[in-house]
Amino acid sequence: MNQTINYIKELTAIASPTGFTREISDYLVHTLEKLGYQPVRTAKGGVNVTIKGQNDEEHRYVTAHVDTLGAIVRAVKPDGRLKLDRIGGFPWNMIEGENCTVHVASTGQKLSGTILIHQTSCHVYKDAGTAERTQDNMEVRLDAKVTNEKETRALGIEVGDFISFDPRTIVTETGFIKSRHLDDKVSAAILLNLLRIYKEEKIELPVTTHFAFSVFEEVGHGANSNIPAQVVEYLAVDMGAMGDDQQTDEYTVSICVKDASGPYHYDFRQHLVVLAKEQDIPFKLDIYPFYGSDASAAMSAGAEVKHALLGAGIESSHSYERTHIDSVAATERMVDAYLKSALVD
């Protein structure tokens, strides 16, 4: 589990908003090669690796995504601040007050700043607390001496430059992991650690398994392509959603029965439930009402496979998120148990 936590820290330290994932793809390729694998980078920028199993006729496909929420420069404002366009789905208040980095395409520089509502000062603006947060009043205050559009553009900033959010990753003495982008870098870390263990311990899986690290999940078309024809089961490892009426918590693995795309495959879900009960893996079944995954994207793209979704419980999803090492451990055990099991009947 210590190595999984290390992978989480390393992954969250790399900026990877959807569409700006070259660095994290490079990290994955380098890490997998060091483990002794031969990863393949897809045309879209994802990274895949395959472990040949005892059954090489029917295959499994397991995914986690390493792209995250982010933003992009929409315009340079007359006062030198930046107007934003969001990448991924989240309300503006989820990023208000967050430190950020502008990745300047023309120079390769990284410029720091803070995301704020325009009328931030409560000493000046009566509506500082009541104004609706919208694209028109949310902006980046650059950490540079700029007071107008010309000065900002002189820094090389242009429309289309990506903006990443400070993850602020913290692991507490009580076992909590607090960070942005635990969705879905927790799952990616779990897959990396299992791949490490399988290689070091020379474990042979019962079924040939493709591990896919996707980079477009947050905008709806992650690992929905490059699925080998032999694949019959597709497992997305992604976050479990917490809130009112939810069973998911920060201490168990969450198995999704339905999200916004509809129900997941019943027999596959029950296969996971039986494994969890047999191996005393703490789990919760749940519905994620406003949610889609790589697996649901694959189904929408026409994949003819059994599909399932599970993951660690993530509190305050798409904001400053939190989970606990107990949930990470339960999720890792669940994925491991599945990968060592027979195919779903």
Map each language-model feature to its residues.
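N-terminal hydrophobic/helix-forming segments and targeting peptides
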Residues: 1-345
